[in-house]
UniProtKB/Swiss-Prot annotation:
GO biological process, one term: proteolysis
Organism annotation: Haemophilus influenzae (strain ATCC 51907 / DSM 11121 / KW20 / Rd)
Residues given in the record as Zn(2+) binding sites: H298, H302, E321
Entry's family note: Belongs to the peptidase M1 family.
Protein name: Aminopeptidase N
Cofactor: how and how many bound: Binds 1 zinc ion per subunit.
Cofactor requirements of the protein: Zn(2+)
Keyword Transit peptide annotated: no
Site (Transition state stabilizer): residue numbering on this chain: Y382
Organism superkingdom: Bacteria
Keywords per UniProt: Aminopeptidase, Cell inner membrane, Cell membrane, Hydrolase, Membrane, Metal-binding, Metalloprotease, Protease, Zinc
Annotated GO MF terms: alanyl aminopeptidase activity; metallopeptidase activity; zinc ion binding
Active-site residue list: E299
Length: 869
């Protein structure tokens, strides 16, 4: 196929805009009639034609100012109206279209989810409903009338406030909604269905009462309470921290089972993947609870950073997403453990985003070129985008950052803005030059800091030499110097933190790295210090400093920055694993350093000082986390070395793990920071003990005694990964209990996909026919196929190529039904350059097979083309 790219530099204001749109939906899963009456306003007096976006529906009729209109041309993607004889500055167009929601497997536009009907319009889904100027810089007021069978669809929901309703004689009913705030078409939403409803209210700081409504499938009401409490907590936090108050009279959330993304921030009517709404102790883990709280907050925070201030064009996506991810991370940090949240965010960034930076899909947080916009809802735009916002916060401080936020909101409320508008507001509010900092928006790749040091004993001077570079990426060969905030601390041999000073003046602990090579000098340092570099992960960069084992052991023991203590452990683990991978490749015996075992024993035996941090330090990095530290990934070597280290740590510290495991006792399940920390530590001890002779009996007992899903899944997970004798019995028991609950079965499918068995692929292929598996449900696909391709390093990358062929078969099938999900699942295949020549050949062969598929979607074409070029 020949897919046309769009470029950021080509942005032009529209010739026309939309001021108001009236939508009438006559809903039926097999035949929905949509009437759209749209008021247009001319912006360019020279324009003689109006091109409206639209596809995937049956076009019925068009009227211009109430009269039939025939001066138009259609193609597969648009409707172009000839207006050379129509000079009015304002006019009205009425378009009627027919849709079949039941057959829309792409889950974009209007589609059937279970027994209900809903929409997903971001980024370009509205054009699958009717013809429209489907671009984010066209903001209009919406009135929506929905008519449907009352028995089947008792709830009819859309954006804004309910203004009217009624019943018809034929058993149908209707509801009309008015959203007074102009919004782009991607924020339109509609839901029709039969739900259980949880109602609550929130009183804003100005005294307004907001009705809160949370809709879930019948029978799930007891799993909705946590989501509602999370929403109220987020609304209060946004008022307190950002001084932002909700603006409508009602806020609705609907949970649906068939959803491509996590959730969608449609104005006043959020539509959520049920995974991020439903929770009770029997069905959801601690991680599920925390994820729900975070995603609920993220979508709510979009009300201001995304909806009230939206994006001018999709190249500016990080304007709303990077900022809102930063805001939801801060919410989680303020309401939970800041250190735990920071460390978990960094783990994800280093494993997933750094890999994307090094892949054929490398792009800046503000991309320059796009074929399929859905492909740029990426960890770079979201998570790296959030890191760029965080660096601004580090440079400006909380007070300066909030000054910039207030100016940004004041200047852009009700508008479609750009990344430049945001940086400019920060700059002007703080009287600071951010010209060099702007390069973070336009430069792709992961910067690297090469750091060396020297100590002058005579003058008590310590020097850090910092060199920055960014390796060439697939989209950019030439790189420039960035403004990198490098947060540091210095410790003496006894663990005492040194004052940072130069010529008698105190220095900030944030060093501004702006040149290719810079030297930072510290005076009054008595004795060669141990440097703590990149405290709190102050910039999304890779660090190259030759840490000695004893330095890392020192930081692990006495650093007062929790991130640094954890990161020291990560570096110790990585050093040990790299040595063992070399031994594995050379056929030598594997071994583990006694110093590491001693250090881990110390952390374990003092865990009560900081339970959460101790657990994070003691957790062995996953295979994919280790893989990121290798230029060429050896799946077999990494898998063997990690398994050896896990077993050795378990055996060496068995008595300590057993003592802590036995000591921790919890009664009734509660989602509190303290209880979560204790459960995580206890289950970590269980994980290690599973690799000792105590494992089978202990894990089986843990599973049988569990009174919550966190403990149940911990036992089931380690039984599977350690291939214990009890594994099959426990897996069968879990399946029998939960086979009718798709979300819970997702956990089971994911465990099956990551089991270490040689025949795991055969097991997965059989599970594709499991009664609980549905190929058209993205959650099921991600749990089984996605878990295998992304988290079973050794099996997916088997040298036979069987894993690659399996994924290719799935992608060919998905290309027709849901190309957006296909484009997510293809990611492990396009990163072939990180592997050896044999595996590269097999992965390229799989991509070449995909490239010749008939009617290849733009979603897949873009990624395959970039990978193979």
């Amino acid at each position: 196929m020949l897919a046309k790219a769009k470029y950021r530099k080509d942005y032009k204001q529209p010739d026309f805009t939309v001021t108001d749109i009236y939508l009438d939906f006559q809903l039926d899963p097999k035949h929905t009639v949509v009437t759209a009456i749209t008021k247009f306003q001319r912006l360019n007096n020279e324009a003689t034609s109006l091109c409206l976006d639209g596809h995937s529906f049956q076009f019925s009729s068009i009227k211009f100012n109430g009269e039939p209109f025939s001066d138009y041309q259609q193609d597969g993607e648009s409707l172009t109206l000839d207006l050379k004889d129509k000079s009015a500055d304002e006019f009205e167009i009425e378009i009627v279209t027919f849709l079949v929601p039941a057959e829309n497997t792409s889950l974009q536009g209007l589609y059937q989810s279970g027994e209900g009907i809903c929409t997903q319009c971001e980024a370009e889904g509205f054009r699958q409903i009717t013809y429209m100027l489907d671009r984010p810089d066209v903001l209009a007021r919406y009135i929506t009338k929905i008519t449907a069978d009352k028995t089947k669809y008792p709830f009819l929901l859309s954006n804004g406030n309910r203004i009217a309703s009624g019943e018809l004689e034929d058993g149908r009913h209707w509801v009309e909604w008015n959203d007074p705030f102009p919004k782009p078409s991607y924020l339109f939403a509609l839901v029709a269905g039969d739900f259980d409803l949880l109602q609550d209210k929130f009183i804003t700081k100005s005294g307004r009462e907001v009705a809160l409504e949370l809709y879930v499938d019948r029978g799930n009401l007891n799993r909705a309470t946590w989501a509602m409490e999370s929403l109220k907590k987020a609304m209060k936090w946004d008022e307190d921290r950002f001084n932002l108050e909700y603006d409508l009279d009602i806020y609705m959330i609907v949970a649906v089972d068939f959803f491509n993304m996590g959730a969608m921030e449609n104005k006043g009517l959020n539509i959520f993947n049920s995974k991020f709404v439903l929770a009770n102790p029997q069905t959801a883990t601690d991680d599920d609870y925390l994820a729900i709280e975070s995603v609920i907050a993220h979508e709510y925070f979009h009300n201001w950073t995304g909806n009230r201030v939206t994006c001018r064009d999709w190249f500016q996506l990080s304007l709303k997403e990077g900022l809102t991810v930063f805001r939801d991370q801060e919410f989680s940090s303020d309401t939970g453990s800041r250190a735990v949240n920071r460390i978990n965010n960094v783990k994800f960034l280093r494993t997933v985003q750094f890999a994307e930076d090094a892949s054929p899909m490398s792009h800046p947080i503000r991309p320059e070129k796009v074929i399929e916009m859905n492909n740029f809802y990426t960890v770079t735009v979201y998570e790296k985008g959030a890191e760029v916002i965080r660096m601004l916060h580090t440079l400006l401080g909380e007070q300066g950052f909030q000054k910039g936020m207030q100016l940004y909101i004041a200047e852009n409320d009700g508008k479609a803005a750009t990344c430049e508008d945001f940086v400019s507001a920060m700059e002007r509010a703080n009287n600071l030059d951010l010209n060099q900092f702007r390069r973070w928006y336009s430069q792709s790749g992961t910067p690297e800091l090469l750091i060396s040091d020297a100590y002058d004993e005579k003058t008590h001077t310590y020097r850090l030499t910092v060199s920055q570079s960014t390796p060439p990426t697939a989209d950019q060969m030439e790189k420039v110097n960035l403004h990198i905030p490098l947060k540091v601390a210095l410790y003496d041999a006894n663990g005492t933190k040194q004052m940072l000073q130069h010529n008698g003046e105190l220095l900030s602990d944030v060093l501004n790295v702006t040149e290719k090579d810079q030297v930072f000098e510290f005076h009054g340092i008595y004795g060669r210090p141990i440097p703590a570099l990149l405290c709190d992960f102050s910039a999304p960069v890779k660090l190259d400093y030759d840490y000695k084992t004893e330095q890392l052991l020192g930081l692990l023991k006495f650093a007062d920055n929790q991130f640094i203590r954890w990161d020291a452990a990560q570096m110790l683990f990585a050093q040990e694993l790299r040595r063992n991978v070399v031994r594995f490749q050379q056929g030598e015996a594997l071994e583990i350093s006694p110093e590491i075992l001693t250090a881990l024993s110390y952390v374990l035996n003092h865990y009560e000082k900081d339970i959460e941090l101790a657990t994070l330090i003691l957790t062995l990095p996953k295979e994919m986390e280790f893989a990121e530290s290798f230029k060429t990934i050896d799946p077999d070597g990494i898998s063997a070395a990690r398994a050896f280290m896990q077993a050795q740590i378990a055996e060496s510290l068995k008595d300590d793990f057993l003592r802590v495991y036995t000591h921790i006792r919890l009664n009734d399940y509660q989602v509190t920071q303290q209880d979560i920390a204790l459960r995580v530590m206890r289950n970590l001890c269980l994980t290690y003990l599973a690799y000792t002779n105590l494992g089978n009996n202990l894990v089986q007992k843990h599973y049988n005694n569990a009174n919550n899903m966190t403990d149940t899944l911990a036992a089931l997970s380690v039984a599977t990964k350690a291939a214990l004798l009890c594994r099959d019995v426990l897996l069968a028991d879990f399946e029998q209990k939960w086979q009718h609950d798709g979300l819970v079965m997702d956990k089971w499918f994911a465990l099956q996909a990551t089991r270490p068995d040689d025949n795991v692929l055969e097991i997965i292929q059989l599970l594709m026919d499991h009664p609980s598996f549905n190929f058209n449900n993205p959650n099921r696909l991600r749990s089984l196929v996605g878990s295998f391709a992304n988290h079973n390093l050794k099996a997916f990358h088997n040298v036979s190529g069987s894993g690659y062929r399996f994924l290719t078969d799935v992608l060919i099938r998905l290309n027709e039904s849901n190309p957006q999900v296909a484009a997510r699942l293809i990611e492990p295949l396009i990163r072939f350059s990180r592997f050896d020549a044999q595996r590269q050949t097999l992965m390229k062969r799989a991509l070449e097979r995909l490239s010749v598929v008939e009617n290849l979607s733009k979603d897949l074409f873009e990624k395959i083309e970039k990978a193979l070029q």
